Amino acid sequence: MENMSEQALPHEVNQVAEQHWQRLAEAWPDISEQLTPEQTKELKTIFGLSDFVAEQLCRHPNWIVSLFEGQLSMLARDSFSSELHSILAGANDEEQVKAILRRYRNRQMVRLAWRDFLGYAELNDSLLDLSALAEALIIAARDWLYGQMCQQYGTPCDSEGNPQPLMILGMGKLGGRELNFSSDIDLIFTFPEHGETQGGRRSQDNQQFFIRMGQRLVNLLNQVTVDGFVYRVDMRLRPYGESGPLVVSFSGLEDYYQEQGRDWERYAMVKARALGPWSAYSDELHDMLRPFVYRRYIDFSAIESLRKMKQLITQEVRRRRLTDNIKLGAGGIREVEFVVQSFQLIRGGREPALRQQSLFGAIDTLYKLGQLEYLAVDELKQSYLMLRRVENLLQAIGDQQTQTLPQHLLDWQRLCFALGMAGEAELRTHIESAMAKIHRYFKETVGGQESDEVAEQWTAQLWSLVDDEDAEALLKEHGVEESELWPALKSWRGTVAKRTIGPRGRETLDKLMPWLLQEFIQLPTPTKAFLPVSKVLDQILTRTTYLELLFENPGARQQLVSLCMASPWIGEQLAKFPMLLDELIDPAQLYDTTSLDDYPSELRQYLLRVPEEDMEQQMEALRQFKLSQQLKIAAADVTGVLPVMQVSDHLTFLAEAIIEQVVLQAWQQVSKRHGTPSYLAPEEMGFAVIGYGKAGGLELGYGSDLDLVFLHNYTRDKYPDAQQTNGDRPIDIGHFYLKLAQRILHLFSTRTTSGELYEVDMRLRPSGASGLLVSEIEYFGSYQREEAWTWEHQALVRARFLFGDNRLAARFSELRADVLAMERDKAELAKEVREMRQKMRTHLLKVDEGCFDLKQSPGGIADIEFIAQYLVLANTHDHPELAIWSDNVRIFEVLSELELLPHLSAQHLTQAYCYLRDESHRLTLQQAPGQLPQESVDLHVQRVLAIYEQVLNNGQ
């Protein structure tokens, strides 16, 4: 390849080169005597092109001579591993290892960036070098750490005494040996067999050994020091993501993928590769994963899965307003990967040659198998190479993980110089041409049908009319009798005319409105649909991409109109959060409500698209996931697709999945700063979240807040040797849990562009608002037994463990059962429950005349809940099974089975309770007050009041 240093630098680039050169001259005064004129010119050229190279060489000028003495030529990739192992052999502690790894990484990255910018290397060689370097750094760190830990804890062995290694799966581009310049690395840690360590002072379970090792290995690579980092390590692709153990055995891995593996995990596994020297364990691992990834039959279902994944990416691009993104945009790098991997997933079960991690290898195989024509292969490869070259150079400018084209002239000039282009316009033309070719093949292979623009309609004429008589005549001619539509449309159009939309937005609106009007006029009351839809349009007039989304997707238009008609609440959600319009594109997917058990894995997949270290985007993603899933539940609810009995179940399971991720994120953020409590074993948190009220009773509604209590299991008496966390900034363990609780509440309550996640109410904790934010679990138990009021025991009936350590779950269950089973005077208990109910009614009941408040009116939801709570508190001493459930419906079932409540009474209470809750959901979606006409509920109310009288006034 041509040496680009012989070309003259553009003016702006040359200025930057001179600035860096001055810095180097200060660090190395006799530089001019050490270098030839040609070397000086070349060094100045690379200084102008890459701030990263200049920064590193100004810090380490001694590298320059060795680079010119032969390091800039092609090096054998195998040498990375042997060099690193040799250097690390002399390291005594992890701080030394961190310094060695980072300096080696930076030195090699300088060499590779130099070769890339000045045309010394073909792209494929650069990608192979970058991948080999990453693999060598990971494996050298692993091997050094394994040796240290075996000395410290003994060697992990299987049942026959064979040493067990830590196996590392490299995912994504690392697995495919196609790593880009400044990439994070996705890894999965695993080990072959369970067993124990041998040769240490005390034996330790293999999994605990490898979890400790995995944590330390991530820290060796990930932590930012004065020398930077080695790689940003992302472990979220492991089974169960952040909520799963950091390391699992081969059998644990196999069980997970056989029983719970998702389609997106199949896609991720196509590129999975065991890193390091190949061994029998590597073969075993790949043989085990193969049946999950590659089905024995031709598997066309993979296409739909990839299509959904691409839709998620498109939504993310739109929501984050990512423009000029050569990876995620239409025709970007990801679309080439989708095209190739769709063939691999469909046919890899039948064609062993397709079972490879390399995209280049797979695409050549597709040509040999006749699946792609020569022109398609050539255009895809050349376009992909073009985009990957641009991506690599973009990242090598400042060692930044970016796929977005430059915002500034300087970086455009750097790219154009390295690529031999005259300027931004020429380079943009090449990039746009490459992306257009890729997108064409993507649509043919994966993309599905896209709507075409269709012929002019009479509604287009209506949208452009000014004269009232003409408009009314046109409407009448086409059978639209409603008189309110035209005045509403004309008024709104006048308001829109005053808005600053821009030519593209106005043009798109003019194309969209005739289609929306077609939807309105098919309805009996078009204006009733137009008004809420116009509020949504008001919010997206300046977001042209959303106007285009509605124009290009007939299904989205139909769903927008029908859902706004069915529920003002949904209309308001769409207006407040326009990103939800993405959910309307595919009606089949919109009404395919996530199954209850899948919320955690769906959320995990959703969060994978956001960098783990970007806390702001993580918080935003949590809120967007909640909003989109809530929309799906509401859409299925108002259209009758989801039975009303299941609405609360879905809203509750959704909340639990979010609680899990919030706690994990908070834990990660606090422990990153302070370390973890030193008394904990790896993977333990010593922390639990307890749900009260609707969260505890599996009865959340659309606008429900969360009643939560936080518990931990640490006391100084129990763990006298552990008083602080084990991080760089240690703090008292009690203070750690307080910070964790505060962080959790912050993540819930922070208002981002997508609003607040949930409102959290902590007043049910011991001593209420004056109590500690997080309580030690035994203190919680003693408080409940000795200090809590009856109303707090009533609240405990509806309490349920939501997330945290299993040991705390078991202990909380015991404590709750013990407190509920305390012997109580039934007459005194009934009196206290009645008084509390009356107090609530006095303070909270505000109802219009002739109406019934679903919650607080006599015979309403609160009365039913108090009946259940009284009966549990009065009878659990003799019937412990009453403490099993926290939801009212199952409590009534158990009371009926135990004959503590007549079967007919239990049935009437359940029917009334479900009816009132269903009406509550319906009224929320209609944005109506929680009231019904009194006569509509009389039968249910009379039954409830009769049972209330019998149970609580007679002290049953």
From Swiss-Prot:
GO terms for biological process: regulation of glutamine family amino acid metabolic process. Keywords: ATP-binding, Magnesium, Multifunctional enzyme, Nucleotide-binding, Nucleotidyltransferase, Transferase. GO terms for cellular component: cytosol. It comes from the Bacteria. Residues 456-956 are annotated as: Adenylyl transferase. InterPro entries: GlnE (IPR023057), GlnE_rpt_dom (IPR005190), NT_sf (IPR043519), PII_UdlTrfase/GS_AdlTrfase (IPR013546). It catalyses: [glutamine synthetase]-O(4)-(5'-adenylyl)-L-tyrosine + phosphate = [glutamine synthetase]-L-tyrosine + ADP; [glutamine synthetase]-L-tyrosine + ATP = [glutamine synthetase]-O(4)-(5'-adenylyl)-L-tyrosine + diphosphate. Transmembrane segments: none annotated. Involved in the regulation of glutamine synthetase GlnA, a key enzyme in the process to assimilate ammonia. When cellular nitrogen levels are high, the C-terminal adenylyl transferase (AT) inactivates GlnA by covalent transfer of an adenylyl group from ATP to specific tyrosine residue of GlnA, thus reducing its activity. Conversely, when nitrogen levels are low, the N-terminal adenylyl removase (AR) activates GlnA by removing the adenylyl group by phosphorolysis, increasing its activity. Belongs to the GlnE family. This is Bifunctional glutamine synthetase adenylyltransferase/adenylyl-removing enzyme. It comes from Shewanella loihica (strain ATCC BAA-1088 / PV-4). The gene is glnE.
